A protein has these predicted regions:
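Hydrophobic targeting/anchoring helices
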Residues: 270, 275-456, 462-463, 541-593, ...
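N-terminal carbohydrate-binding accessory modules
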Residues: 1-36, 418-421
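A short, well-structured beta->alpha microelement
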Residues: 22-29, 295-301, 459-479
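A conserved amphipathic helix/loop scaffold
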Residues: 371, 488-744
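Polysaccharide-binding and catalytic clefts of secreted carbohydrate-active enzymes
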Residues: 93-309, 313-316, 324
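Hydrophobic faces of well-ordered beta-strands that scaffold small-molecule active sites
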Residues: 18-22, 40-42, 77-81, 155-159, ...
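The substrate-binding groove and active-site-proximal loops of carbohydrate-active enzymes
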Residues: 16-23, 43-59, 115-137, 236-255, ...
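Aromatic-lined substrate-binding rim segments of carbohydrate-active enzymes
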Residues: 28-112, 133-134, 141-149, 259-268, ...
């Protein structure tokens, strides 16, 4: 992976490429090769090839690779090497103290074999140095074998472990059980504390406990992990031990990934790709806490030279027909760190066989035409954010065994290949800001973790008619160039980060929207004064837990005039939206209570109050050319956000109701509902529709339409259209007509 045209790009034999990949088994490889795909990821067969201490059976893996080669002579392969699954029971049997231990809220051990939902054989502790050492030897042996026998056919290796091979900790999906209470985890925690604090006195000051010692510190109890002291928030004065443990869990998890990645790189002499799943910061119902998952150490992963790419499936909520495609990780952050993001496009086509589908059945495509519309929407999202992706035959049921689908994939492959020649600058003027570390400072299972992040994005903010960028909180000071920032879950903010963000947003022309308790927690205390400092509006703390909901005040500001109904919003799902969420316990959605924050500033213009009370909960203040908005509840309505964005100078490409991406010269517009739509170019630019020239197999500006400031086009339901932007002189930007034909 090297930089090319301003972004990290995959090089194969010295040639840069931006092509899509696929995932599947040999039985489906012809479906993808027919569609112009030449890179295929596949699962290494179970039971595990790692059969004993430095004992390996590569036979089934060899047979699978040989079958790929026989069916598709030019395919390049990416084995997905997963640790901990069936066939590795022998390791746990001989190292019982190195397995992750889960306890229920009463501190009673739970038998993992009775609650596991996947064929897990060895649920190794993230703190196990013995497992890491042995697995590293096995990883080296696997890569060495593959390179010696199939080196010219292997593109690289994806390393998996934990639940779903996505490095979720083993107990993460088990309701109301907490980890890790194994001897290995306890010793790892003590090592972490020694590295962090150095001596007992520093530890005692941090934990505010005179009796604690580095040599005897224990993993916090399940009850402490389960319930924060401040209902939703953790108090650093009395819960620093909990946060230290959760940070240790992620650090150890990342450490195992990094060790295996380095060994794999060494075994292939740094000539092949190595990547992993990681950084899932956008939760759904059973991934509610990156802290519990072990996914808070993204910065460490991004700094590891042995890791070339990071991948994740796209989000499972509201993803089918009429829904939207967004990553579960942070693709732009990954790209800014110089690594590839690989989007796992596990879209269910009309050939999927219920219940073997990805996500809920609501909105499944009924035919090839609807399948193609979903896949084009997916491609638009990937090309409009960062990196590339693989088309996934998730259950090896041949979801792509359709000539219409294969023709569409070939068209999208050509567009991806052509994009190699384009610059990659994002034209988004609104950025949503998420924070991985803050997940350690809040309730691990509250639905508020979703409401303040992914539910709002998936349900309210996707189709506002302008593109969105994503930043992590620690990137705002360096990369923030937006007109509008939405700070979603930035509960914890230390002094340096706080100063960087304030310096970035307190500038003329910048609007910042702060949700709930952004900045409430710092290193040593929870304090409403922290919120006041960050938001720039004087705030008051309401300690009584309540459901955060806001009712708009008619006539309070032009931005809420002629407000859409309902006039209230917050941590509550309507029935039609529940149908578009990934399945989960209904009771989960009723657990969204939290202390709240009220505006107490005469200079602020209050436009909304909490439902069930009169406390000001939504307010705007304008000072020295910058604007700050406090919003005490999640799910700020999309129409209201669109109005705030327009007031702040954000260019609207379309009216609300369409999802827009604009990266380099490529503009994509996806419209869930059928209807006429006008697409308007940003100031100083012209746009022209793109069309696919079948005879040349290339995307071209439509010769029937000249570059112009706006284009009006009828859209079918769930249709995506592509446009190319050029400067106001009409000078055509490079379309990469030559492309990389080797990708086909």
């Amino acid at each position: 992976v090297e930089s090319f045209n301003g972004r990290p790009m995959l090089f194969i034999n010295g040639e840069p490429t931006t092509e899509f990949w696929c995932y599947g088994d040999p039985g489906a490889i012809e479906d993808f090769v027919s569609a112009g795909i030449r890179i295929c990821q596949f699962h290494v067969p179970f039971p595990s090839w790692w059969t004993g201490p430095e004992q390996y059976d590569f036979g089934p893996t060899d047979e699978k690779i040989e079958e790929f080669c026989a069916r598709a002579g030019s395919v390049l392969l990416m084995p997905r090497v997963n640790f901990g699954y069936v066939g590795e029971e022998w390791w746990g049997d001989s190292h019982p103290d190195e397995l992750a231990v889960g306890l229920d809220p009463d501190g009673k051990p739970v038998d993992y074999r009775q609650v596991r939902s996947l064929p897990v054989g060895c649920w190794f502790s993230s703190g196990s140095q013995e497992w890491t050492r042995d697995a590293a030897r096995a990883m080296h042996a696997f890569v060495t074998h593959c390179e010696e026998r199939f080196g010219d056919r292997i593109l690289g290796y994806q390393i998996g472990g934990g639940i779903s091979a996505e490095w979720f900790r083993w107990w993460y999906f088990v309701e109301d059980v907490y980890e890790d209470y194994s001897p290995a985890a306890r010793e790892a925690f003590r090592r972490y504390l020694r590295n962090r604090y150095g001596d007992d006195m520093a530890l005692r000051r941090a934990w505010n406990r005179p009796d604690v010692c580095l040599a005897t510190a224990e993993v916090p109890s399940p009850r402490k992990l389960r319930q924060p002291a401040e209902c939703y928030f953790r108090d650093p004065a009395i819960e620093r031990d909990v946060v230290d443990w959760l940070e240790c869990l992620s650090e150890a998890n990342a450490g195992q990934i990094m060790t295996l990645a380095k060994v794999a790189k060494e075994a292939c002499r740094w000539q092949k790709l190595v990547g992993t799943f990681y950084g899932y910061l956008w939760p759904h119902w059973n991934t509610r806490s990156p802290a519990r998952a072990g996914h808070m150490a993204l910065r460490r992963i991004l700094n590891e030279k042995a890791i070339d790419f990071i991948s994740s499936p796209y989000h499972y909520d509201n993803r089918h027909l009429g829904g939207f495609h967004h990553s579960q990780t942070v693709p732009q952050t990954i790209e800014r760190a110089g690594k590839l993001h690989l989007d796992e496009i596990d879209t269910s086509t009309h050939l999927a066989k219920p219940p073997r589908i990805a996500g809920r059945s609501c909105g499944l495509p009924r035919n090839a035409e609807e399948s193609c519309r979903l896949l084009r929407r997916d491609a638009a999202s990937v090309l409009g954010t960062a990196g590339t992706g693989w088309w996934m035959d998730l259950y090896n049921d041949r979801w792509y065994a359709d000539l219409e689908i294969q023709a569409e994939i070939r068209r999208l492959q050509r567009l991806a290949v052509q994009s190699r020649e384009w610059d990659c600058d994002s034209h988004a003027e609104l950025a949503v800001v998420v924070d991985d570390r803050s997940s350690a400072w809040c309730h691990p299972t509250s639905s508020l973790n979703q409401f303040f992040t992914s539910v709002a994005r998936q349900m309210e903010w996707s189709d506002l008619g302008f593109p969105l960028d994503t930043l992590t909180a620690w990137e705002v000071g360096r990369y923030g160039r937006a007109r509008v920032y939405l700070f979603l879950n930035c509960w914890f903010m230390d002094g340096d980060l706080r100063r960087e963000i304030i310096q970035r947003v307190r500038r003329p022309g910048v609007t910042s929207v702060w949700f709930h308790g952004c900045g409430f927690i710092e290193k040593n205390r929870c304090d409403v004064a922290n919120v006041t400092e960050l938001v720039g509006i004087r705030m008051r703390y309401l300690p009584e837990p309540a459901l955060p909901e806001i009712e708009l005040i008619p006539g309070s500001d032009p931005v809420v005039e002629d407000a859409y109904t309902p006039r209230s919003f917050g941590a509550r799902l309507s029935d039609d939206r529940t149908d578009r969420m990934l399945d989960g316990p209904a009771a989960h959605w009723d657990a969204a209570r939290t202390p709240r924050f009220a505006v107490d500033d005469p200079q602020a213009r209050v436009i909304g109050r909490y439902v069930g009370g009169r406390e000001p909960a939504l307010a705007i203040v304008e000072k020295q050319g910058w604007r700050s908005v406090f919003c005490g509840a999640p799910m700020l309505p999309g129409w209201l956000l669109a109005r705030l964005a327009r007031r702040s100078g954000v260019h609207a490409y379309t009216s609300p109701g369409a999802q827009v991406f604009h990266r380099g010269p490529l503009i994509s517009v996806y419209k869930p509902q059928a209807g006429l739509l006008r697409v308007e170019a940003p100031a100083g630019m012209l746009i022209q529709p793109l069309m696919f020239a079948e005879t040349q197999q290339v995307w071209r500006p439509d010769p029937r339409t000249k570059p112009c400031a706006s284009v009006e086009t009828p859209f079918e339901a769930s249709e995506t259209r592509f446009y190319v932007a050029c400067d106001s002189s009409g000078r055509e930007l490079p379309m990469g007509a030559a492309g990389n034909r080797s990708a086909e």
